[in-house]
Amino acid sequence: MNVEIDISNVKLETERLILRAWEITDLDNFFEYASVNGVGEKAGWEHHKSKDESLEILKMFIDEKKVFAIVLKENQKVIGSIGIEECRQDLDKNLENLLGRELGYVLSKDYWNKGIMTEAVSKVIEYCFKILKLNYLIATCFNYNVASKRVLEKLNFKFYKDIIIKTRYNTVEKSTLMLLKNN
C-alpha cells in the first residue's frame, strides 16, 4: 500500500550532503549529469539530449514533490537524485496491507564509488521509517549495475525476487528487486 509523499519542505543533512526538494535554479547542474551517456541508462532512462528536456523533467520533480535533489555541502552543487516512488511491482500478500514505497536513485558519474549514494540513501531510509512510518522500502537494480546493488546490500536490503524491466528506451533488462523492512 502506498502513502502520500510531499518532500517540498523537507531538508535532510548528512556529513557531506543536503537532500532537499528540487528548484528551477538546479537546471544547469541537473543537465550536467543527466546528459552524460551511461548515467540515466543505469537507472532506466536515456541521457538527456537538451536543457529543455531536463527542464521538463525538473518541473515534474518539483510538481510531484517526491524526488530529493542530492546537494554537495562543500559547493552546493546538485549531483544526483533520490525518488520515493509508488511501489510498481507485484508484491506478495504479506506486504499488501503495509505502507511502503520504492526508492530510485541516480548520481553524477563524477561521484561514483565515493560512498555518496550509500550516505544519501541511508538518510532517506531513516526519513521514510522514522518520519513517514513506512513498513518497508523496495528498490530495483539492473543485474549488470553491481554498484547500485552494492549500495542496497550495504544498507541491509535483502533479495526479494528476480524481475524483468522494460526500460524507457525500449530495452529489456534482467533485474533484482530488493526489500528492506522497518523492524
What label would you give each PLM region?
Residues M1-G40, V67, V71-N183:
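Acyl-donor (CoA/ACP) binding surface of acyl/acetyltransferases
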Residues L58-A69:
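A short helix-loop-beta-strand connector motif used in the catalytic cores of GNAT acetyltransferases and
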Residues G38-K59:
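Conserved GNAT-fold acetyl-CoA-binding loop/helix
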